[in-house]
Amino acid sequence: MRQTFMANESNIDRKWYVIDAEGKTMGRLSSEVASILRGKHKPTFTPHVDCGDHVILINAEKIYLSGNKAEDKIYYRHSNHPGGIKSISAGELREKNPVRLMETSIKGMLPKGSLGDKMFKKLHVYAGAEHPHTAQQPENYELRG
């Protein structure tokens, strides 16, 4: 009788992928990256195990925001002091800190809790085209669609 394969931390082969975000739509790119970080592209995917790969996302400053999201999409944060709410539009955040824009988008698509935190640590976002991970010999990843 065959048994269903269950991955665990010891038998997971992790790869490194480079994805160029230039001209890509933010939401579509984020969902694809979240899927890679989770390991859903592998036949050995196990929901309760971190079996994803490392993703290096370059050119985050050249991401495309469709529609009016650059002006209409608002990100909020609070300092926990009275009247301490701050807001910034997606377009302003892309100009000021494109890395945080992509990290926020991708983190929202990962599982909540400690497993999602482990998956998120395998994401490496850079505003420009350069990254310091050449020693890991990353492969270029072609997005679907």
Swiss-Prot record:
GO cellular component terms listed in the entry, alphabetical order: cytosolic large ribosomal subunit
InterPro entries: Ribosomal_uL13 (IPR005822), Ribosomal_uL13_bac-type (IPR005823), Ribosomal_uL13_sf (IPR036899)
CDD domains attached to this UniProt entry: Ribosomal_L13
Keywords of the record: Ribonucleoprotein, Ribosomal protein
Biological process, per Gene Ontology: negative regulation of translation; translation
GO molecular function term, any single one: structural constituent of ribosome
Cystine pairings recorded for this chain: none
Subunit structure and binding partners: Part of the 50S ribosomal subunit.
Function in brief: This protein is one of the early assembly proteins of the 50S ribosomal subunit, although it is not seen to bind rRNA by itself. It is important during the early stages of 50S assembly.
Similarity comment: family membership: Belongs to the universal ribosomal protein uL13 family.
Name of this chain's protein: Large ribosomal subunit protein uL13
Gene it is expressed from: rplM
